[in-house]
């Protein structure tokens, strides 16, 4: 009987585009799906993500490390999120080459590293976003009682725990993958057998989905809902000294990234794990999962481009740094020209920004709060 094989990201089975249409070996077991479109789609999206993600996250890390003081607990979570994005982006050139050429010449080790980087980024991003959401929940709902919990030391410990968790999951999944050679063409992260799916990968996938997606999703929705409900009380805003509109922007951007990038991908992956482990045997669902997987995979990788919006709307000092640097660049552009009016110096600009921050409904506290 035909061993029907399918492709899904890091849990991809045999390459249907590199061999004649698999899945139609018998009349009784036919489920033909042509998903060869995914190679050009993945290659194009990865190229965009590589360029935009490399620029935005590199600039963000530069600002975090050299242009602003990392005083808040949330800044620690966001820095780790940027590092996770940047590490993944650095592996994308290999994936771009593979998808456009449909051949992996880089060896088994880089294949495993590439897969581990993907899992680490996807689930690390969700967990770091969850940390930010929980931190915001504590800061707004329990602004005084949470002071002993919300420390930079505790934030660093939590980040270390997240890295250990996602690296363990990513490495565990990558151990079962290897490069395969078919007709002088080498594939990467394709060729998992039914036995591997039933014995290992289905269990690893379900564990990763529960710990890395379902629990974070529940926490994000719950924390955001409670925060929104708390903000309806006028006394809350006077206690935390911040602006309601700013908090609403933070929550909106945060949840938009989570829902657009991660919910579709993990929903399809969960279905695919059930299909491959034969917990569900339905050709329509197999076709649906195989067609939708590359599309949702591309949405998931776009988180590297969207995360900088979270940095901007979450950290007040991040906005301030860009404001100051923009003025510095404007000064340098007109330095050789005779000015009609005296341009403000950098200290004056910093003082102006500081005054604006102080006067906007206690936004200075926003930095220490979020």
Swiss-Prot record:
One of its GO terms (cellular component) is plasma membrane. Residues 65-73, 134-155, 225-254, 316-370 are cytoplasmic. Disulfide bonds join 111-188. Residues 1-43, 95-112, 177-203, 276-294 are extracellular. SMART domains: 7TM_GPCR_Srsx. Gene3D superfamilies: Rhodopsin 7-helix transmembrane proteins (1.20.1070.10). Receptor for lysophosphatidic acid (LPA), a mediator of diverse cellular activities. Transduces a signal by increasing the intracellular calcium ions and by stimulating adenylyl cyclase activity. The rank order of potency for agonists of this receptor is 1-oleoyl- > 1-stearoyl- > 1-palmitoyl- > 1-myristoyl- > 1-alkyl- > 1-alkenyl-LPA. Belongs to the G-protein coupled receptor 1 family. This is Lysophosphatidic acid receptor 4. It comes from Homo sapiens. The lineage of its organism: Eukaryota, Metazoa, Chordata, Craniata, Vertebrata. The gene is LPAR4.
